[in-house]
Amino acid sequence: LVAIVGAANPGFLRPANLLEMAGDIVPLFVMALGMTFVVYIGGIDLSAQSMANLITVVATIYLATLGPFVALLCIALGFGLGYLSGFVTTRLLVPSFISTLATGGLAFSMAQWLSGQRAVTMDADQRNRVFGWMIGKTGIVPNELIIAVVLLGIALFIERRTTLGRVLKAVGAGELAAAASGINVARFKILAFAISGSLAAIAGLIFAVKLSGGAPTIANGFLLPAIVAVLVGGTPLTGGVGGVLNTAIGTLI
C-alpha cells in the first residue's frame, strides 16, 4: 500500500513526510506500549483510553498553577489509577476486563466533573513556554518521535534487564508455576497495570499539548487500535511471549 501511494505521489515517501506521520501516531504507540505489559501477563487494560482523556483535562486545567510539574501530577494520577486496577484484579480476584472497565468509568467520570462536561483549552503562550519543546523538531525529526524512542528504550530495558521484566514473562508463561516458585505474583501484576496507567497518562499529556486542550472524549477511538497494535506485533492475549519491540512494529503496521 505504501509503495502504491508512493508511486502515485512521490512526495509521500519524503523522509520529512514519513517522520511527520510517525510523529502523529506517538500517542497511540505510547498507549500501546503500556498496554503491552498488561497483555504480556495475560490481562487486558480497557481503561487506557479514558485515562488519556482524563489526563488531557487535568493537564489543561492545572498547567496554569503547576507549570511543568503538571506532568508529574499526570503521571502520578495514571500510576495510581493503574495501581487501583491491578489491586482490584489481583486482590479482589476481579477479571482485568471488568476491573479496568470500571477504572475507565471512574476516569471518565472524573474528566466529566473536572471539565464541566465540555472541552477545555490551554493558554497557548503558557503551553509553548512549558511544553513547546514536545511539539517542536530536532532537524526534521519531530520531538514526539524522540520521546517515543526514549520510552521504548526504557520499556525495553525494563522488559529484558530487570527482575520485573523477567517475572512478568514468567507470569505470562505460567502464573501457577511462577507462584509455586515463590514469586509474589500479585505484586508484580499490580506493577504491570501501574506501568500501563503511567504510559496512558503520558499519551494523554502528549495529546493535550499537541491539541492545546482536552476533553472527556478527546482520545476516543484509540483503545481498539492500541490493543490491535499489541496483538499484531505478536503479543497474544494469553501472554508470555512478544514484548514492547513487537508493539513498536505492530504500531507501524
Task: Give each language-model segment a name.
Residues L1-L13, I41, Q112-S115, A119, ...:
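Structural signal for alpha-helical transmembrane segments and their membrane-water exit/capping regions
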Residues L92, S96-R161, F188-L191, K210-A219:
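Transmembrane helix-bundle core of multi-pass membrane transporters
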